[in-house]
Amino acid sequence: RVVAAALAAGCRVEPVPGACALVAALTASGLPTDEFHFAGFLPHKSGQRANRLAGLAALPGTLVLYESPFRIERLVAELAVALPERPVVLARELTKKFEEWLRGTPAELAAQLQV
Protein backbone atom coordinates (compact mmCIF):
# COMPACT_ATOMS: atom_id res chain seq x y z
CA ARG A 1 0.00 0.00 0.00
CA VAL A 2 2.89 2.35 0.72
CA VAL A 3 4.40 1.80 -2.74
CA ALA A 4 1.02 2.27 -4.42
CA ALA A 5 0.52 5.54 -2.53
CA ALA A 6 4.01 6.77 -3.43
CA LEU A 7 3.42 5.97 -7.11
CA ALA A 8 0.02 7.69 -7.03
CA ALA A 9 1.77 10.78 -5.63
CA GLY A 10 4.15 10.77 -8.59
CA CYS A 11 7.16 9.52 -6.66
CA ARG A 12 9.72 7.23 -8.25
CA VAL A 13 10.08 3.88 -6.48
CA GLU A 14 13.31 1.96 -6.90
CA PRO A 15 13.83 -1.56 -5.57
CA VAL A 16 16.84 -2.47 -3.52
CA PRO A 17 18.65 -5.15 -5.53
CA GLY A 18 18.98 -8.55 -4.01
CA ALA A 19 19.35 -12.11 -5.08
CA CYS A 20 15.95 -12.25 -6.76
CA ALA A 21 14.59 -10.13 -9.63
CA LEU A 22 11.11 -11.44 -8.80
CA VAL A 23 11.10 -9.84 -5.35
CA ALA A 24 12.73 -6.63 -6.57
CA ALA A 25 10.09 -6.18 -9.28
CA LEU A 26 7.21 -7.16 -7.02
CA THR A 27 8.15 -4.80 -4.20
CA ALA A 28 8.45 -1.77 -6.48
CA SER A 29 5.49 -2.62 -8.73
CA GLY A 30 2.80 -1.01 -6.62
CA LEU A 31 0.69 -4.16 -6.99
CA PRO A 32 -0.52 -6.09 -3.93
CA THR A 33 2.22 -8.17 -2.32
CA ASP A 34 0.18 -10.00 0.31
CA GLU A 35 -0.57 -12.82 -2.15
CA PHE A 36 1.31 -13.48 -5.37
CA HIS A 37 1.94 -16.36 -7.76
CA PHE A 38 5.18 -16.80 -9.69
CA ALA A 39 4.63 -18.56 -13.01
CA GLY A 40 8.14 -18.21 -14.45
CA PHE A 41 8.35 -18.35 -18.24
CA LEU A 42 5.28 -19.37 -20.22
CA PRO A 43 5.54 -22.20 -22.77
CA HIS A 44 6.58 -21.21 -26.30
CA LYS A 45 3.68 -22.86 -28.17
CA SER A 46 0.57 -20.71 -28.60
CA GLY A 47 -1.97 -23.28 -27.42
CA GLN A 48 0.04 -24.13 -24.33
CA ARG A 49 0.52 -20.43 -23.55
CA ALA A 50 -3.22 -19.75 -23.87
CA ASN A 51 -4.05 -22.68 -21.58
CA ARG A 52 -1.50 -21.58 -19.00
CA LEU A 53 -2.77 -17.98 -19.05
CA ALA A 54 -6.37 -19.20 -18.67
CA GLY A 55 -5.34 -21.13 -15.58
CA LEU A 56 -3.41 -18.19 -14.18
CA ALA A 57 -6.36 -15.84 -14.78
CA ALA A 58 -8.36 -17.79 -12.19
CA LEU A 59 -5.76 -17.26 -9.46
CA PRO A 60 -6.25 -14.49 -6.93
CA GLY A 61 -3.46 -12.08 -6.09
CA THR A 62 -0.63 -10.69 -8.15
CA LEU A 63 0.80 -12.80 -10.97
CA VAL A 64 4.51 -12.61 -11.77
CA LEU A 65 5.79 -13.83 -15.13
CA TYR A 66 9.19 -13.75 -16.78
CA GLU A 67 9.42 -13.16 -20.53
CA SER A 68 12.09 -12.67 -23.15
CA PRO A 69 12.37 -9.13 -24.54
CA PHE A 70 11.81 -10.66 -27.98
CA ARG A 71 8.35 -11.98 -26.95
CA ILE A 72 7.12 -9.18 -24.68
CA GLU A 73 4.74 -7.64 -27.23
CA ARG A 74 3.25 -11.08 -27.88
CA LEU A 75 2.77 -11.60 -24.14
CA VAL A 76 1.05 -8.23 -23.70
CA ALA A 77 -1.32 -9.07 -26.59
CA GLU A 78 -2.10 -12.44 -24.98
CA LEU A 79 -2.70 -10.76 -21.61
CA ALA A 80 -5.17 -8.40 -23.31
CA VAL A 81 -7.23 -11.47 -24.25
CA ALA A 82 -6.80 -13.56 -21.08
CA LEU A 83 -6.76 -10.80 -18.44
CA PRO A 84 -8.00 -7.61 -20.15
CA GLU A 85 -8.77 -5.61 -16.98
CA ARG A 86 -5.98 -6.91 -14.74
CA PRO A 87 -3.39 -4.29 -13.78
CA VAL A 88 -0.02 -5.06 -15.36
CA VAL A 89 3.45 -3.81 -14.54
CA LEU A 90 6.30 -4.40 -16.97
CA ALA A 91 9.69 -4.05 -15.32
CA ARG A 92 12.85 -4.40 -17.36
CA GLU A 93 16.55 -3.79 -16.93
CA LEU A 94 16.09 -3.54 -13.15
CA THR A 95 18.87 -1.72 -11.30
CA LYS A 96 20.56 -0.83 -14.58
CA LYS A 97 21.02 2.47 -16.39
CA PHE A 98 18.01 1.94 -18.67
CA GLU A 99 15.62 0.59 -16.02
CA GLU A 100 12.04 0.95 -17.23
CA TRP A 101 8.62 0.55 -15.66
CA LEU A 102 5.36 0.46 -17.62
CA ARG A 103 2.06 0.29 -15.76
CA GLY A 104 -1.55 -0.11 -16.88
CA THR A 105 -3.97 -2.58 -18.40
CA PRO A 106 -2.64 -4.90 -21.11
CA ALA A 107 -4.14 -2.59 -23.76
CA GLU A 108 -2.46 0.44 -22.19
CA LEU A 109 0.88 -1.36 -22.10
CA ALA A 110 0.48 -2.39 -25.74
CA ALA A 111 0.02 1.27 -26.66
CA GLN A 112 3.09 2.27 -24.61
CA LEU A 113 5.19 -0.41 -26.31
CA GLN A 114 4.19 0.88 -29.78
CA VAL A 115 5.65 4.34 -29.10
Segments and roles (model prediction):
Residues 62, 66-115:
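A contiguous loop/helix-start segment that scaffolds small-molecule binding in enzyme catalytic cores
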Residues 2-59:
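Class I SAM-dependent methyltransferase SAM-binding "motif I" and its flanking Rossmann-like core
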